[in-house]
């Protein structure tokens, strides 16, 4: 029997007593977002809308985006990436599980020095694809040209943010490249592997958010 979205007690600032609210609503109040499904229009609008709202509410506090996704639509993923570069707060990107295809592109889009992968996470990058077989010849040629432009743009972003030469990234994207957290750090996709933070903070305060859950 599915349990649905868990509810947790949360005291809204100004209220005397805690009320039961959806877990995700509590996390949103703590500036913590989740990308845990295929990247399509609905989840893209959801995440980008929250990023804009949180930026308006407080432009100084960081936003945390947890990622566990196999990727999805190219344009939708680029919309999330562009929003991350536009909003005022720094955005932590944290990979747990897997960040594949466009999800790895979003992981890459976090604030430099604030891109994190959990120790057993997997990251995969490859080139964008399109369903050519559905198009007639003129449409096929136009789609190939557009896809080539998008591929070059994505490759340039990977090269710029990882520090790898353009040709290296281009060759790697010819196939599915799976990386461990340590390999992704060496490649430049992330800056920190989670166990490094645990080792550093094991005898001090919580690793992520010292002020988190203060109203629970």
UniProtKB/Swiss-Prot annotation:
Matching InterPro entries: ClpP, ClpP/crotonase-like_dom_sf, ClpP/TepA, ClpP_His_AS, ClpP_Ser_AS
Protein's name according to its UniProt entry: ATP-dependent Clp protease proteolytic subunit
Keywords, sorted A to Z: Chloroplast, Hydrolase, Plastid, Protease, Serine protease
Function: Cleaves peptides in various proteins in a process that requires ATP hydrolysis. Has a chymotrypsin-like activity. Plays a major role in the degradation of misfolded proteins.
Assembly and oligomerization: Component of the chloroplastic Clp protease core complex.
Similarity annotation: Belongs to the peptidase S14 family.
Top EC class of this enzyme: hydrolase
A cellular component annotation (GO) from this entry: chloroplast stroma
Molecular-function GO terms, alphabetical: ATP-dependent peptidase activity; ATPase binding; serine-type endopeptidase activity
Location in the cell: Plastid, Chloroplast stroma
Catalysed transformations (reactions): Hydrolysis of proteins to small peptides in the presence of ATP and magnesium. alpha-casein is the usual test substrate. In the absence of ATP, only oligopeptides shorter than five residues are hydrolyzed (such as succinyl-Leu-Tyr-|-NHMec, and Leu-Tyr-Leu-|-Tyr-Trp, in which cleavage of the -Tyr-|-Leu- and -Tyr-|-Trp bonds also occurs)
Organism this protein belongs to: Zea mays (Maize)
């Amino acid at each position: 029997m599915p349990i649905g979205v868990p509810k947790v007690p949360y005291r809204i600032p100004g209220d005397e007593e805690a009320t039961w609210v959806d877990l995700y609503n509590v996390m949103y109040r703590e500036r913590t977002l989740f990308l845990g499904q295929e990247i399509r229009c609905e989840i893209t609008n959801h995440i980008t809308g929250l990023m804009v709202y949180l930026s308006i509410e407080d432009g100084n506090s960081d936003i945390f985006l947890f990622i566990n996704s196999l990727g999805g639509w190219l344009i939708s993923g680029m919309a999330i990436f562009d929003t991350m570069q536009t909003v005022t707060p720094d955005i932590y990107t944290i990979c747990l599980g897997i960040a594949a295809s466009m999800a790895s592109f979003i992981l890459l889009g976090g604030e430099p020095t604030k891109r994190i992968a959990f120790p057993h996470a997997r990251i995969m990058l490859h080139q964008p694809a399109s369903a050519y077989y559905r198009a007639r010849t003129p449409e096929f040629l136009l789609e190939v040209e557009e896809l080539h432009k998008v591929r070059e743009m994505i490759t340039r972003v990977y090269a710029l943010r990882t520090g790898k030469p353009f040709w290296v990234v281009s060759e790697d994207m010819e196939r599915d490249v799976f990386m461990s957290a340590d390999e992704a750090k060496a490649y430049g996709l992330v800056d920190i592997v989670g166990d490094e933070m645990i080792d550093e903070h094991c005898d001090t305060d919580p690793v992520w958010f010292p002020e988190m859950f203060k109203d629970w």
